[in-house]
Amino acid sequence: MTLLSSNELRKLIQATPHLLENAVDIETQIQPNGLELTLKEIKTIEGVGAVDFDNSERKVPDAKPLEFEDDDWIHLPKGIYKVIFNEIVNIPMNLAAIAKPRSSLIRCGATLETAVWDAGYRGRSESMLVVYNSAGFRLKKNARIMQLLFYTLNSEVEEGYSGVYQNENTK
């Protein structure tokens, strides 16, 4: 497993399908070892969720969109939120990705909770934003909040991601 550099990421962004679509400013979002994703939407999580072994009883709680102010800022009190990214990611069958919050979030008392991004996944993903700071946290629409680190797999997978979140938020 090898972490991809910005040079390799640039090639994949230009390939078909593009590794990343709908970037706000791709030159700013390409970092030495990853791609930054930007904030499209924020929602509150409403209700109870449930996870079981075979997903037959899985329930993702409803979410209520929050509105940005006229200046595109939003103040978030301490708590948890769902964030949706602007970018659509297309992960090739020989790559996987791990997402990390930008260090600026952590320095402000907030972080992101994410999962592994599997080979073959395509979509505009969601993550959980946790605001720990008792004074809250301000975010601007299109802020760069997460960095995706892409790793080459030892061999291409035979079958890529095919779960319920495939192509999420792309319609």
UniProtKB/Swiss-Prot annotation:
Its EC number is 3.6.1.23. Keywords: Hydrolase, Nucleotide metabolism. This is Probable deoxyuridine 5'-triphosphate nucleotidohydrolase. Belongs to the dCTP deaminase family. Archaeal dUTPase subfamily. The keyword Hydrolase applies. The gene is dut. SUPFAM superfamilies: dUTPase-like. Pathway: Pyrimidine metabolism; dUMP biosynthesis; dUMP from dCTP (dUTP route): step 2/2. It catalyses: dUTP + H2O = dUMP + diphosphate + H(+). The keyword Transferase does not apply. HAMAP family: dUTPase_arch. One of its GO terms (molecular function) is dUTP diphosphatase activity. This enzyme is involved in nucleotide metabolism: it produces dUMP, the immediate precursor of thymidine nucleotides and it decreases the intracellular concentration of dUTP so that uracil cannot be incorporated into DNA. GO terms for biological process: dUMP biosynthetic process; dUTP biosynthetic process. It comes from the Archaea. It comes from Methanosarcina acetivorans (strain ATCC 35395 / DSM 2834 / JCM 12185 / C2A). It is an enzyme of class 3 (hydrolase).
